[in-house]
Design a protein with these regions (language model features):
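Membrane-embedded transmembrane alpha-helical bundles that form the catalytic cores
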Residues: 1-376
Length: 376
């Protein structure tokens, strides 16, 4: 069920009401059951995949914490286990999300050499939310490996962390240091708090407004313009580009706001995902404000893992480029998104090289590059 559906408008108040009626010790179980019901309402079979990702990372984290990091051999074994776990989770994501893209790319290359294409009909549906909850689980696993988080012993609590229904479909991508820590803190008694619940509902209402009143309405302009671009002049195409920029922001941020508001009514604080990104003064700052949970995830687990800025300048630039290419592939399984990610990586590299010039023209530059990048 979508947030902006009648089903959710029935589901959420029922979950909230029962949550505050049942005893505190029952509430996590109730939220877990509600989260799986919410997720499996799309496709019950996909619940098995969610459970598999949860089980693999839960067991992997427990095993990682048992190992002694002081001894060299144990440290090597620990790294091997981490790599195996990461490959297993990415393999599940890749099978559903990237197999079709991989086969199509192979066939394009084969066609260049006039070789018969690989004839495999690929029509497996992509499990909704898989791009989000796999990153949540992988982030937790890597945090345990790095010693930044304790492995969770309670499987049901960890399963709730991965599947928490407000954020499983569209984020924010949660961290063990935030949401799991809140789930672990038994000292917090989440009793009915009218002020907090009212604040959560107001946040949700603002999200619904952005989605239903702005995003869905302005999408008509963007879709019409780019559906038949040959029918429009320069002004019409510029209006379409601006409309698309507004649409994608309002559409995506609306889901994050609804998630934040829903979690808040239940007594949880999720990561804020957007901080007025179109007011950023540079491309780098834009990505510090746009889809913050993804940007920080890629920074912490991809960019830093490759060496981050603790290496030569050109190695650092390579790390930036690869990180944004990964971001592009995460957003969509096709060459357009891959190039889109590389394009934003190049923007950041050029900004670093031309920082003195960029500071003078950032008011013009960041708007144009962001608009062009999204349309591309």
């Amino acid at each position: 069920m979508l947030f902006n559906s009648i089903d959710f408008l029935i589901f959420f108040p029922a979950v909230l009401l029962v949550y505050f009626i049942v005893p505190h010790r029952i509430r996590p179980t109730w939220l877990l059951l509600s989260s799986y019901y919410f997720y499996m309402s799309w496709n019950p079979v996909h619940g098995i995949l969610l459970l598999a990702v949860t089980a693999v990372t839960y067991l992997g984290a427990r095993l990682l914490q048992r190992m002694d990091c002081e001894q060299g051999k144990k440290k090597r074994n620990k790294k091997i286990i981490l790599v195996a776990e990461v490959i297993a989770v990415i393999g599940m994501l890749g099978y559903f999300k990237y197999t079709g893209f991989f086969l199509d790319s192979i066939n394009v290359v084969l066609a260049k050499f006039r070789i018969a294409p690989v004839e495999i009909e690929w029509n497996i549906a992509l499990p909704i939310g898989i791009s989000f909850y796999t990153l949540t689980a992988l982030g937790y696993l890597i945090d345990v490996y790095r010693g930044k988080s304790e492995a969770e012993h309670n499987f049901l609590r960890y399963a709730l962390f991965v599947s928490f229904f407000p954020q499983i479909l569209s984020g924010p991508i949660e961290r063990s240091t935030n949401l799991l820590r809140q789930l672990r803190d038994s000292s917090i008694k989440r009793n009915w708090n009218t002020e907090r619940i009212a604040s959560g509902f107001i946040t949700m209402l603002w999200g619904f407004f952005l989605k239903l009143v702005i995003a869905d309405r302005i999408a008509v302009i963007a879709d019409t313009t780019f559906g038949r671009p040959e029918c429009y002049g320069t002004f019409g195409l510029m209006l379409g580009a601006v409309s698309y920029g507004i649409q994608i922001y309002c559409d995506f941020s609306s889901y994050s706001l609804i998630a934040l508001g829903a979690a808040k009514t239940l007594g949880f604080d999720l990561i804020n995902n957007f901080e007025t990104p179109y007011f950023a003064q540079s491309v780098t700052e834009f990505w510090h404000r746009w889809h913050i949970s993804l940007s920080t995830w890629l920074r912490d687990y991809v960019y830093i893992s490759m060496g981050g800025n603790r290496c030569s300048k050109w190695h650092q630039y390579w790390n930036i480029l690869v990180t944004f290419m990964v971001s592009g592939l995460w957003h969509g399984a096709n060459w357009t998104f891959l190039i889109w990610g590389a394009l934003h990586g190049v923007y950041q590299i050029l900004e670093k090289e031309l920082r003195p010039v960029v500071r003078k023209i950032n008011g013009y530059c960041h708007t144009k590059t962001a608009s062009f990048g999204y349309r591309f």
